[in-house]
Structure formats: C-alpha cells, structure tokens
A protein has these predicted regions:
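A short beta-loop-alpha structural element at the N-terminal edge
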Residues: 1-13
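Helix-loop element at the rim of GNAT/NAT acetyltransferase active sites that forms part
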Residues: 15-27, 65
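Active-site rim helix/loop that mediates acceptor-substrate recognition in acyltransferases
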Residues: 24-43
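Conserved beta-strand in the GNAT
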Residues: 52-61, 73, 78
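A short, polar/charged loop-to-alpha-helix boundary motif
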Residues: 64-70
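Conserved acetyl-CoA-binding loop-helix of GNAT-fold acetyltransferases
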Residues: 79, 85-98
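Conserved active-site alpha-helix within GNAT-family acetyltransferase domains
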Residues: 90, 114-119
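Conserved GNAT acetyl-CoA-binding A-motif
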Residues: 101-113
C-alpha cells in the first residue's frame, strides 16, 4: 500500500535513510519531529511485509517570490533492494503527483538525480 508517512513510521524511515544515505545522517527523533512540523515536505511510503517499509519518497514544496504557486521537488526516492523491479517507485511518484495536485495548483514537478543514478 502506498500512503503518506506518519510519525509511527519514524523508526523505519531512519533505517531506510541509513540504507540510502549512510548511517548517522539523522535520528528517529529528528524524523518524527520533521513529520510533525515540516509543512514544506511531503513523505510518501510503500508498505512492505512484516511491518517494514519497502521504500519512501520525499517531496519538498519550494516557494519563490517570483511565482504564485508552489513548485514540488522530488528530493529523495528509495526502494529497498528486495522490493525493486515491482513498480513501487513509480507507484509512490504517481501517488505524490496526485496528492500534490489535490492540494496545490501545480503546473510541473521537479526531479533531481545524482550523476551515479542508474535507475
């Protein structure tokens, strides 16, 4: 199931982030606080099996004085290796796009990737 992340996902998101970005980049407490207070970020998760998450997507809502509307930027996409090849990243990105369209008058999405991205 693809859904918005909740504070109950903080521990799993910390583990996923450690797999994705390396250990020590954030803490469960910091993730929990961000999920509760950061109104400029949307986090989407994919449920895996056994209470684990299969992956996550982060969308930052950028605002510029030059434009009336928010510009969503997909800043993180991660799917655990054992769940890859099943279309989970595509499902999370579609969910993010549809969710943002319901809330904000969007004209486009921005996606940045690293030079070593092979997906």
């Amino acid at each position: 199931m693809i859904r918005l992340a909740s504070v109950d996902d903080a521990a799993e998101l910390e583990l996923l982030n450690a797999e994705f970005n390396g250990k020590g980049k954030t803490t469960e407490e910091s993730i929990r606080a961000s999920l509760l207070t950061n109104r400029r970020e949307i986090v989407i998760v994919a449920d895996g099996s056994g209470g684990r998450l299969a992956g996550f997507v982060c969308v930052q809502l950028k605002k510029s004085l030059c434009y009336e509307d928010f510009m969503p930027e997909i800043t993180e996409v991660y799917v655990r290796p054992e769940y890859r090849g099943r279309g989970i990243a595509r499902e999370m990105l579609t969910f993010a796009q549809e969710y943002c369209k319901k809330i904000y008058p969007l004209h486009s999405f921005e996606l940045l990737t690293g030079s070593d991205n092979t997906a």
